Swiss-Prot record:
Coiled-coil positions: 431-630
Predominant localisation class: cytoplasm
Entry protein name: Transforming acidic coiled-coil-containing protein 3
UniProt keyword list: Acetylation, Cell cycle, Cell division, Coiled coil, Cytoplasm, Cytoskeleton, Mitosis, Phosphoprotein
Ranges for region Disordered: 42-70, 363-385
């Protein structure tokens, strides 16, 4: 969601986009020009300059939201933020609130309004010959186009067709939630255009007509999402004058429309989709379809406080701008440097100077094409019934969006084609004409109301049939869902059976393979067993032969045993003899050994005696030698 500050011309740049009280995005550049744009740009000095040299005229500052004149005690008081739109909360106004007429400057304001209207008629006359579509879209400046009232939201309905206009598609206001109140007729003044009350809950009575002023026809805001509602036909008119931006006089209401002298096709805001509804076909305009703006959400605030007009006062431009700006409008009036923006300056001068009177001269207005306008209005009323409810105007929404479509011919300001007559104009229409137009509009509103009621009953019946169709569709969907579930279950079972079959086939194939292997092994074992049987027979024969041989060898063994026993007996006898001989020899040897030992012992004794004798002899010899040496 994006918030945009309105490009208000009566508030300087430093107060509109850079003020601490307005935390919004700076104003965007658009293709549409507003009233007094040139004069205001000349009057407001740029921020870079320290002092403005010449200021032609300065209007009092206005609140960017309500366009009210700011008095000295109101400069620091900002009211509720800009009117944004949301699906759930909207700005509601009082039920029985009536537009307030200007208090002091009514004649002056009338003259200013006539000047603006004359200028618009002049531009329309200039552009009529060049473009037929432009002339058809500018017919509303001559006659009052009745406001298109939105249709009350029925409680339980189905589709919501939105039939848009064929020639010029105005912005559509959101249809608010229904209430149990009655819409009262609002007869707007010829000069001051107050806001139109929002649509409240649907009343149990008939809808009352709402007539706009001769200069301004309020637009229709986009249709919001109905919460728990069904079919809601929103039928728009074929010829709707786009909103005019600047406001001539302040009023005591929350939202005020903005008047614009140059006719520019306003952007169409998107139609939101309903939350609990069916399809909503939108038939676009056939000729001109302006760019679509995103829908903004309103802040959750109540109604703006009603400001007393007594507190409003005119402020000097030097107090507002903080520079020594001089008002030299009267000095430049009538000179050669009087530019074509003086039309707007003179209109402001006429508005704020009660001493200036009407001029006997008036510009030549373009002849109004009343018959074609009424015919087109009748065709639009008979061919495409409009909504029968009054909707809330949102002139403070996002209007500063670049226009993607080519600029209309009628939006271009003609240069050098301004008449030389004085600007001040007298009233063109009398009160009787206004009353006649009001009566015509009331009759048209009654016809539209009856058509709406017929369409509403048809749509209610259609909603019932659609509900039955939805029930049947739900039942068929449930049955289809059940069938689908059963089909899925059957498919699952089939898949399981197929898997089991594949498994059994695989098992069977493996069993066949194993059986073939087993049979081959059986054949091999059979051959082996046959070989074993042959071997057994041959072995049995060999065992019989071996038994015969063993018996023969046993007999031989017995014979050898007897022979060996005899040989052993003989050998034992010989051994006994040898033993006896050996013992006798051992005894003889032992005796000889004893004898040898005795001899050896005796020899050892004699050796010892000899050694002793030798020792004594050697001692004696030593003694003798020693004695001999001494001698």
């Amino acid at each position: 969601m994006s918030l945009h500050v309105l490009n208000d011309e009566n508030v300087p740049n430093e107060k509109s986009s850079q003020c601490r009280d307005f935390q919004f995005l700076p104003p965007e550049l658009t293709g549409r020009s507003s009233v007094l744009c040139l004069s205001q740009k000349e009057n407001v000095p740029p921020q870079s300059q320290a002092k403005a040299t010449n200021v032609t005229f300065q209007t009092p500052p206005r609140d960017p939201q309500t366009h009210r004149i700011l008095s000295p005690n109101m400069t620091n008081k900002r009211e509720a933020p800009f009117g944004l739109q949301n699906d759930h909360c909207v700005f509601l106004q009082k039920e029985n609130q009536r537009p307030l007429a200007p208090v002091d400057d009514a004649p002056v304001v009338q003259m200013a309004a006539e000047i603006l209207r004359a200028e618009g008629e002049l531009q329309e006359g200039i552009l009529t010959s060049s473009s037929l579509s432009a002339s058809t879209s500018l017919l509303d400046s001559e006659l009052v186009t009745p406001p298109i009232e939105p249709v009350l939201e029925p409680s339980h309905q189905g589709l919501e067709p939105v039939l848009e206009s064929e020639l010029v598609t105005p912005p559509v206001e959101p249809v608010l939630e229904p209430s149990h109140q009655e819409l009262e007729p609002v007869l707007e003044s010829e000069l001051v255009t107050p806001p139109i009350e929002p649509v409240l809950e649907p009343s149990h009575q008939g809808l009352e007509p709402v007539l706009d002023s001769e200069l301004v026809t309020p637009p229709i805001e986009p249709v919001l999402e109905p919460s728990h509602q069904g079919l809601e036909p929103v039928l728009e008119s074929e010829l709707v004058t786009p909103p005019i931006e600047p406001v001539l006089e302040p009023s005591h209401q929350g939202l005020e429309p903005v008047l614009d002298s140059e006719l520019v096709t306003p952007p169409i805001e998107p139609v939101l989709e309903p939350s609990h509804q069916g399809l909503e076909p939108v038939l676009d305009s056939e000729l001109v379809t302006p760019p679509i703006e995103p829908l903004l959400e309103p802040s959750h605030q109540g109604l703006e406080p009603v400001v007393d007009l007594k507190e409003e006062s005119f402020r000097d431009p030097s107090e507002v701008l903080g520079t020594g700006a001089e008002v030299d409008y009267l000095e430049q009036f009538g000179t050669s440097s009087f530019k074509e923006s003086a039309w707007r300056k003179q209109s402001l001068y006429v508005k704020f100077d009660p001493l200036l009177k009407d001029s006997p001269l008036r510009p030549m207005p373009v002849a109004p094409i009343t018959n074609s306008t009424q015919d087109t209005e009748e065709e639009s009323g008979s061919g495409k019934p409009t909504e029968a409810e009054l909707v809330n105007l949102d002139f403070l929404g996002d209007l500063d969006v670049p226009v993607s479509a080519p600029t209309p011919v009628w939006s271009l300001e003609p240069r050098g084609l301004l008449p030389a007559e004085p600007i001040v104009d007298v009233l063109k229409y009398s009160q009787k004409d206004l009353d006649a137009v009001v009566n015509v509009m009331q009759q048209e509103n009654l016809e539209l109301k009856s058509k709406y009621e017929d369409l509403n009953t048809k749509y209610l019946e259609m909603g019932k049939s659609v509900d039955e169709f939805e029930k049947i569709a739900y039942k068929s969907l449930e049955e289809a869902e059940k069938q689908r579930e059963l089909k899925e279950i059957a498919e699952d079972k089939i898949q399981k059976v197929l898997k089991e079959r594949d498994q059994l086939n695989a098992d069977l194939n493996s069993m066949e393979k194993s059986f073939s292997d087993l049979f081959k092994r059986f054949e091999k074992r059979k051959e082996v067993i046959e070989g074993y049987q042959k071997n057994e027979e041959s072995l049995k024969k060999y065992v019989g032969e071996c038994i015969v041989k063993i018996e023969k060898e046993g007999q031989r063994y017995q014979a050898l045993k007897i022979h060996a026993e005899e040989k052993l007996r003989l050998a034992n006898e010989e051994i006994a003899q040898v033993h006896s001989k050996a013992q006798a020899e051992v005894l003889a040897l032992q005796a000889s050994l004893r004898k040898a030992q005795m001899q050896n012992h005796s020899l050892e004794m004699t050796l010892e005696q000899k050694t002793k004798e030798i020792d004594e002899l050697t001692r004696i010899c030593d003694d003798l030698i020693s004695k001999m040496e001494k001698i």
